[in-house]
Amino acid sequence: MQASQLINSLKFKQVQPALTTDFDVTMLTQDTREVQPGAMFIAVVGYHVDGHDLVDQAIEKGAKIIVASKPLDVNVPVIYVENTERAMAILADVFYGAPSQKMRMIGVTGTNGKTTVTHLIEQIYRDQQQATGLIGTMYRKIKDEKLPTANTTPDAITTQRTLAAMRDAGVETVAMEVSSIALVLGRVWGIDYDIAVFTNLTQDHLDFHKTMAKYTEAKAMLFAQLGNKYSADGTNKVAVLNTDDPVGREFEQYTAAHVLTFGLKPDAMINAQNVEIKSHGTEFDLSVFGHVTHVTMQLIGQFNVYNMLAAFAAAYASGIPEDQIIKSLEKVTGVKGRFQSVPSHTGVSVIVDYSHTPDGLLNALETIQDFATKDIYCVVGCGGDRDKTKRPKMAKIAVEHSTKPIFTSDNPRTEDPTMILNDMVAGVPNADVPVYEDRHVAIAKAIEAAQPGDVVLIAGKGHEDYQIIGRTKHHFDDSEEAAKALALKPTID
């Protein structure tokens, strides 16, 4: 693509020196390791590295034009903008030919449930014989091909490149997790969402947003942009909102799109009544504008009823018949690391769950309480370099809602694991909770002690197959560790 086309896509900018001869831009990147001759290098200020400090490296490797927000002394044209991350999103959308406008885009935001909801949506549309794409915490997926991802919502270039690959592969519908951080940083600018889904909002990411008010504002941005200038047709946009959460009602005021509500309360357009949670699944009556159908799903827990309602509403908004949506949802067995049962012949039930927020942990434990008949073990830790105020809250929830809590490390990152655990212990001063810094030991101890009929919840990491210590990822999989510990116990026929 010609440099002039990219420059013209940015309304407010300065180009120094002025471009006298146009040339072809071969690629966009913010990573000097990726730079190829003819690249446009975008200098982004990151958490640990400032791209402006790497501009000379990028030019040495062949970058022909730079996007920056700080003064530079270089011998190639520089496009100066206020915010390079947001500029990157617009440039990527233009460079890759606005791929989101060629597919049905369903964005899902909220504190908990995004991964499960996007996977449920993907299953529904696959059963409609549609080619699907998925972008989220676990991976990016183009039809059946899975690609690794580093963030819930990748950077704008990666996202637009992925969407372009989906478009070129014939994908018709994309289910995409949209994080609050991505919304604030402008990573999804230029993406033309058709349906935006809100799951819930509870405490998370306050290390980034600082306050719940700012966190709420970040989530609201997804709904405010429905029908924005990027939309080819704003009249068919739909906001799918959980109105059991007061924030859902608030978001109604932020969007000009059509609104479809869901929840357990009967005032929601799509709601669930008579919920019955069992050890092997959940049953309820689904009401869609008053039309009631009994649903039996294999997913367990009230929180999964909300996830199912969100996915149902998103599919319903695009015209898929009720009975076909229900058929798809009833056959889903689960998502890796989301209230995932580890195979066991020991009489001990082991569940691995990604619950890394206070509300997520509470949901998981309350669900277990609905069917547990004996002791509940809860192996839980808190991440380092993240919101410290969650630590005492999660510790308190573990102590109050399980009979055998155990505190351990999660991803300590650059923090001292002992200090993280001390923060947790401080939240339950009157409790005597075993503490094992080594997560492997904590899991092994819990499963070794558990007796037939007991339930062991391993919380916090879910699908992750690594543990971050310092800045290094080490292989670690909660499901694998649980399986090893279970193998050492006697089996029960």
Curated annotation (Swiss-Prot):
GO terms for molecular function: ATP binding; magnesium ion binding; UDP-N-acetylmuramoylalanyl-D-glutamate-2,6-diaminopimelate ligase activity. A motif (Meso-diaminopimelate recognition motif) lies at residues 410-413. GO terms for biological process: cell division; cell wall organization; peptidoglycan biosynthetic process; regulation of cell shape. The modification N6-carboxylysine is found at residue 219. Its EC number is 6.3.2.13. It catalyses: UDP-N-acetyl-alpha-D-muramoyl-L-alanyl-D-glutamate + meso-2,6-diaminopimelate + ATP = UDP-N-acetyl-alpha-D-muramoyl-L-alanyl-gamma-D-glutamyl-meso-2,6-diaminopimelate + ADP + phosphate + H(+). InterPro entries: Mur-like_cat_sf, Mur_ligase_C, Mur_ligase_C_dom_sf, Mur_ligase_cen, Mur_ligase_N, MurE/MurF_N, UDP-N-AcMur-Glu-dNH2Pim_ligase. Its cofactor is Mg(2+). UDP-N-acetyl-alpha-D-muramoyl-L-alanyl-D-glutamate binds at residues 32, 151-153, 179, 187. Disulfide bonds: none annotated. Keywords: ATP-binding, Cell cycle, Cell division, Cell shape, Cell wall biogenesis/degradation, Cytoplasm, Ligase, Magnesium, Nucleotide-binding, Peptidoglycan synthesis. Pathway: Cell wall biogenesis; peptidoglycan biosynthesis. ATP binds at residues 110-116. It is found in: Cytoplasm. Belongs to the MurCDEF family. MurE subfamily. PANTHER family: MUR LIGASE FAMILY MEMBER (PTHR23135), UDP-N-ACETYLMURAMOYL-L-ALANYL-D-GLUTAMATE--2,6-DIAMINOPIMELATE LIGASE MURE HOMOLOG, CHLOROPLASTIC (PTHR23135:SF4). Catalyzes the addition of meso-diaminopimelic acid to the nucleotide precursor UDP-N-acetylmuramoyl-L-alanyl-D-glutamate (UMAG) in the biosynthesis of bacterial cell-wall peptidoglycan. This is UDP-N-acetylmuramoyl-L-alanyl-D-glutamate--2,6-diaminopimelate ligase.
